[in-house]
């Protein structure tokens, strides 16, 4: 599955589905990631904004931390057994936020968060 809050995501999924493989891709958009998470064994979070000129790491953190927190809360409810990879910057803090969210939900497994 491919998920983003942007409404173009289903179209991107259709484009990706033209790659000649047996993999089926579905696109989901909107505030609720639950439909995209159903059945997922691995979730890769690459959400958030990229660092712009004049933006320091704390500015980046202030934007991306909330996005990661929200997504991980949805993962904890929908697919608590999934492995979660986070590449959202600043990674050293967004992974820590994800760990705390998972601990609060009672589903933290250090071997499944990277």
Curated annotation (Swiss-Prot):
SUPFAM superfamilies with a match to the protein in the record: NAD(P)-binding Rossmann-fold domains
Binding site for NAD(+): 4, 64, 87-89
Coiled coil residues, start to end: none
Any GO molecular function: L-malate dehydrogenase (NAD+) activity
A single Gene Ontology CC term: cytoplasm
Keyword Oxidoreductase tagged: yes
GO terms, biological process: tricarboxylic acid cycle
Broad EC category: oxidoreductase
Catalysis performed (reactions): (S)-malate + NAD(+) = oxaloacetate + NADH + H(+)
UniProt superkingdom: Bacteria
PANTHER family membership: MALATE AND LACTATE DEHYDROGENASE, MALATE DEHYDROGENASE, MITOCHONDRIAL
Role of this protein: Catalyzes the reversible oxidation of malate to oxaloacetate.
Subunit structure: Homodimer.
Family: Belongs to the LDH/MDH superfamily. MDH type 1 family.
Name of the protein in question: Malate dehydrogenase
Source organism of this protein record: Klebsiella pneumoniae subsp. rhinoscleromatis
